[in-house]
Regions:
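Solvent-exposed, acidic/flexible segments
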Residues: 61-68, 92-95, 132, 194
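Extracellular/periplasmic catalytic domains that process cell-envelope and extracellular macromolecules
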Residues: 33, 42, 102-103, 130-132, ...
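N-terminal export signals
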Residues: 3-23
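Active-site HxH/HxHxD metal-binding segment of metal-dependent hydrolases
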Residues: 76-144
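Metallo-beta-lactamase
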Residues: 56-57, 64-65, 144, 151, ...
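Active-site environment of divalent metal-dependent phosphoester hydrolases
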Residues: 67, 91-97, 116-119, 162-164, ...
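Conserved beta-strand hairpin/beta-sheet module of binuclear metal-dependent hydrolase folds
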Residues: 29-73, 166-170, 174-180
Length: 194
């Protein structure tokens, strides 16, 4: 290869190397604040909703263990309060797999009664009980509590995506988290095994 040709080709390739290098060091997750105290975390699987309150941090869903580590690390950078409550919208692993990373960090894990039973059934069948943090608080129809300045209410309207889906309403923010009852740009899925 002639020197002139080499220099031209190298000069043309240089900008693409910069893009490749930047893409290798970009965090694989995103955090988007919806307002001053409420945001969403996305990486792999479902969307995690979090709320900073004067009492502590409320987290809805936990994705998988690696993603939960990223979430916990990022939330600790933004807020010094402890984790107050972890809510699971339903039992699937992309919503509860990261629960184990909250062990020792959060005192309360909340889900619908059927969701807890389903999570326990699947973990027992797969022999993964040691990798789980199961809900220690459940509800059947409606659960509501004022946490900080916001009231958080969970509703169960019957079987949908699973037989244990919760709809979570952050009343002051007027934000609803529906887990996998609502999909973006695709048809919903019904898990007939639950």
């Amino acid at each position: 290869m002639k020197r002139r040709s080499f220099l031209i080709q190298s000069a043309l390739a240089l900008p693409s190397l910069d893009l490749i290098a930047k893409s290798l060091f970009v965090d694989p997750w995103t955090i988007k604040m919806l307002n001053k105290t409420t945001g969403i975390f996305s990486e792999r699987g479902g969307t995690i909703l979090f709320k900073f309150t004067k009492n502590g941090i409320v987290v809805i869903d936990s994705q998988f263990p690696d993603q939960a580590d990223h979430l916990i690390s990022e939330l600790k950078k933004q807020n010094e309060k402890p984790f107050e409550l972890l809510i699971n919208t339903h039992h699937h692993g992309d919503h509860t797999g990261g629960n184990i990373k909250f062990k020792g960090l959060v005192n309360r894990v909340l889900a619908h009664t059927n969701s807890k039973a389903n999570q326990m059934r699947v973990a027992t069948a797969n022999k993964t009980e040691a990798n789980q943090l199961f809900p220690n608080q459940t509800f059947d129809s409606v659960w509501s509590e004022k946490i900080g300045k916001d009231r958080i209410t969970l509703h169960y309207y019957g079987a949908g995506h699973t037989n244990g889906d919760s709809i979570i309403h952050l009343e002051k923010d007027n934000i609803i988290h529906m887990g996998d009852l609502m999909f973006n740009r695709r048809h919903p899925n019904v898990d007939r095994s639950s």
